[in-house]
Amino acid sequence: MRGHYHFIGIGGIGMSGLARILLQQNLSVSGSDIAFNYTIEGLIKSGATIYKGHSPSYITSGSTVIYSSDIKTDNPEYLAAKNLQCSLLHRAELLALLTRQKKSLAVTGTHGKTTTSSLLATTLLEANCDSSFAVGGIIPQFQSNAKHGLGDLFVFEADESDRSFLKYFPYGAIVTNIDNDHLNSYENSEDVLIQSFQQFTSQISSPNHLFWCGDDTHLKFLNGIGQSYGFGEHCNWRISNVFQKDFNLEFDLEGNEKKYPSIKLNLIGRHNLLNGAAVFGLAMSLNISEASIRHTFERFCGVLRRCEYKGEFENTIFLDDYAHHPTEIQTTLEGIRKAIKSKRLIAVFQPHRFSRIKDCLGMYGKIFNNADEVFVTDVYGAGETPIEGISQQQIIQEISENSSVPVKYVPRTALGHKLSEFIQPLDVIVTLGAGDVTKVASETLSLLENGKRF
């Protein structure tokens, strides 16, 4: 690969990772975004030229211009690239080009991609594979979401949300699950969604390195292909004897005609037991030593915005999680509840996108049952046009009608003040959502530390 690459919307987690990989290959990179963040600052330090806002003047003839599904076709830089007859590549097309140079290991599925791919990437790097990776979150151990390695393996997230995962032809893969999310990309049809996953798995060149969740009935089309993992007796890799103490898991795994007792994983929740089993099995199939895998699992620090510890004040703990789909919220709260036992758990939820709320109505009623209090704030639209009759109010009503957990609306601008007045010593607060609710913990802690006491 050579030439100059320009990223429209370079600050996004997927785009910034690809830009970082190109920079590490000593390629010329520029980009633009409407706002600067710490990710962009890191890219600038690595040699990228980045502009604030969008302008056709940022596009130069002969550049390869990268865009994502979030970039509209009337974007001035997109239009300028077309007018200058620049090579235009969707983010997934660039990732496909990069992964073709290696033995690529894709992680796909509706939920769990980022944690699973990050754990897999960390496991391989800790085993001195010098693998490449491009994941959807920042791995604290590397302070990065991407790396260009000299080894022959490349771990990456294959995003199903916009159907772009069909552009990949990986060497091996993990399929975590299939759930009814992003159906607007699949003609609003679950059948089309499942058929797309069937097509993706048919594109894997080494099915011996395909691992899929055997507990997910949507994945039954994979019976007899690759290796399944889960809790069921029918799974090739079976989880048993689970024990969770605080924010750590311990479990047994049986697979490959062998038992692997007392695996320790520095994560919480049933979903992460499944993620861990998938990574353990795939790593073993790649001849990574059991001792190395165990060592990594014990030391793995998770991913930013995945049940991330944000701080505490007088024994009140603040956590933050990216969960915004009902299934993700429920599993996250279940894991936290097991970790904190009887402590009061306050869930602060920021609904994400009007279209997702509409698609998921009927699923919110009981997902907060492991919380003691629920605050629901304004919808984070993520650029979507509001849908008439769809707002946070429908979610609040659904919870009120189906659960005994107290739920109330709090405007986004008032969340910090409300929490600083409401919380008590030993409470655990978790913010949930893919938007700016991630800032609420620091906002609240700042108020508390500056004299706003219990």
From Swiss-Prot:
Please give the Gene Ontology molecular function terms for this protein.
ATP binding; UDP-N-acetylmuramate-L-alanine ligase activity
Keyword Cell wall biogenesis/degradation part of the UniProt annotation = yes
Q: Which UniProt keywords apply?
A: ATP-binding, Cell cycle, Cell division, Cell shape, Cell wall biogenesis/degradation, Cytoplasm, Ligase, Nucleotide-binding, Peptidoglycan synthesis
Where is the protein localized? Cytoplasm
What is a biological process (GO) this protein takes part in?
cell division
Question: One Pfam match, by short name?
Answer: Mur_ligase_C
| Pathway where this protein functions | Cell wall biogenesis; peptidoglycan biosynthesis
Q: For ATP, which residues are the binding ones?
A: G109, T110, H111, G112, K113, T114, T115
- Signal sequence, renumbered to the chain: none
Q: What is its EC number?
A: 6.3.2.8
Q: What GO cellular component is one of the record's annotations? A: cytoplasm
Q: Which reaction does it catalyse?
A: UDP-N-acetyl-alpha-D-muramate + L-alanine + ATP = UDP-N-acetyl-alpha-D-muramoyl-L-alanine + ADP + phosphate + H(+)
| SUPFAM superfamilies in the cross-refs | MurCD N-terminal domain (SSF51984), MurD-like peptide ligases, catalytic domain (SSF53623), MurD-like peptide ligases, peptide-binding domain (SSF53244)
InterPro entries registered for this protein in UniProt: Mur-like_cat_sf, Mur_ligase_C, Mur_ligase_C_dom_sf, Mur_ligase_cen, Mur_ligase_N, MurCDEF_pg_biosynth, UDP-N-AcMur_Ala_ligase_MurC
What family name appears in the similarity comment?
A: Belongs to the MurCDEF family.
HAMAP family from the UniProt entry: MurC
* Function as written in the Swiss-Prot or TrEMBL entry: Cell wall formation.
Q: What is this protein called?
A: UDP-N-acetylmuramate--L-alanine ligase
Q: Which species is this UniProt entry from? A: Protochlamydia amoebophila (strain UWE25)
